[in-house]
From Swiss-Prot:
The keyword Disulfide bond applies. This is Insulin. Insulin decreases blood glucose concentration. It increases cell permeability to monosaccharides, amino acids and fatty acids. It accelerates glycolysis, the pentose phosphate cycle, and glycogen synthesis in liver. It comes from the Eukaryota. Keywords: Carbohydrate metabolism, Disulfide bond, Glucose metabolism, Hormone, Secreted. Pfam families: Insulin.
Amino acid sequence: ADPQHLCGSHLVDALYLVCGDRGFFYNPKGIVEQCCHRPCNIRVLENYCN
């Protein structure tokens, strides 16, 4: 998957998709910086899974 900009509900949807049953902790400051302001990939999202 190519890195992409994910903001707002798109970011939350992507976290649900990547983390599934594990769930995730939503740290807007960190993840918005990494995935909305700059493009990020799935590995970055996985860091936010529980």
